[in-house]
Amino acid sequence: ATQMDSYVKQHNKKWSYLIPCNLYGEHDKYEEHHSHFVSALIKKIHEAKDSVEIWGTGKPLRQFMYAGDLARVIKYMIDNDVVDNFNIAPDYVHSIEEITKIGMESCGKGDLNIVYDNTKPDGQYRKDVDSSKLISVMKDFKFTSLQEGIRRVYDNFSQRYNWY
């Protein structure tokens, strides 16, 4: 960030940088050892018969943003010639357990049990991003809810992989 600010001053160039929270979307990877949390969770839920295993206690809090929302922000910045630096994230946080339950409901498998692997780490308890500066510029911007975003991703996943 500091280097970019210096570059802008030194060369009198317009430059912005956007710092998003955790992203998920239709074009993520679903391969074992190469996927991110939400896509790995969707695949686990899709393949689950009775239960879904998650690492740790399920208590850590996270912000997740639908990738299409980031695309809309980028388009707005370009179309409106906005030059500044922004954190980008919905103002809500969910526990890993809540995200798992939302995923199960969104995938039509709300009756699965959650198994917590307490031999695995929770990681940092909370990771928040403050988007108030972004919202002051994009006053009417609405983030896609986690429920809606995961449903969209699951619909795309089930069509692309057709693993029924």
Place the predicted regions along the sequence by residue.
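Active-site Tyr-X1-5-Lys
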Residues: A1-C21, F37-K49
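Conserved sequence/active-site signature of Rossmann-fold short-chain dehydrogenase/reductase
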Residues: L23-G25, F37, L70
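Short beta-loop-alpha junction of Rossmann-like oxidoreductase domains
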Residues: E26-K29, K133
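Short, solvent-exposed loop/turn segments at secondary-structure boundaries
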Residues: D28-H33, Y125
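A short, flexible beta-alpha/helix-coil linker loop
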Residues: N22-E26, P60-L61
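C-terminal substrate-binding subdomain of Rossmann-fold SDR/epimerase-dehydratase oxidoreductases
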Residues: E47-Y164
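Short-chain dehydrogenase/reductase
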Residues: A1-T2, E31-S39, Q63-F64, V93
